[in-house]
């Protein structure tokens, strides 16, 4: 390990009380990001080809085959379509809509889990950076008063503290905001696809033909 880099990191952490807090927030953000990426990769897939196969079996009246295709699919949408197809045996539109609504809410809850953390971090990180700025300015004026002399060297440490803390807070906030918007876009895409697929299946079952 290069001691220069280690010293630089330690010095940055010592610049302000805000820096360790921002570091912890960054570590938590990255950990949740990795967990959510893995979950979305496994459970948030949208497969139009799977839906087309299910749809073709429904048009032919082969509900068991359609259920089997849905059961082989992976992800929350496949689970929801399988449940809707199970309810389709009764050909009761209200029952199918009820099942679709339940799975819509379930999908929204599972995909939306922990996303609020990114929104919270994007909001409070700049405030922590601002706190670091205030503390840095206070340190600069304190050093100036204790020195009894003026000059840029006296206040340099306090100003650097303010700038580093502010930059770190903005960096964490921007990163969290981008992550939140990305997952929010994915969430809306999955929910819209689920609603369209489910409603189309229910309509085909109800009227007995393709739409």
Predicted feature residues:
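Hydrophobic membrane-targeting segments
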Residues: 1-51
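Hydrophobic alpha-helical transmembrane segments of polytopic membrane proteins
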Residues: 160-178
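Predominantly long cytosolic amphipathic alpha-helical stalk/bundle segments
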Residues: 44-131, 135-149, 181-211
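Acidic-residue sensor for enzyme active/binding pockets
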Residues: 35, 161, 200
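Alpha-helical membrane-interface segments at transmembrane helix boundaries
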Residues: 6-18, 101-122, 152-164
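Alpha-helical transmembrane segments of integral membrane proteins
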Residues: 19-32, 119-126, 172-176
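Residue-level signature of catalytic and energy-coupling elements of molecular machines
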Residues: 16, 30, 66, 81, ...
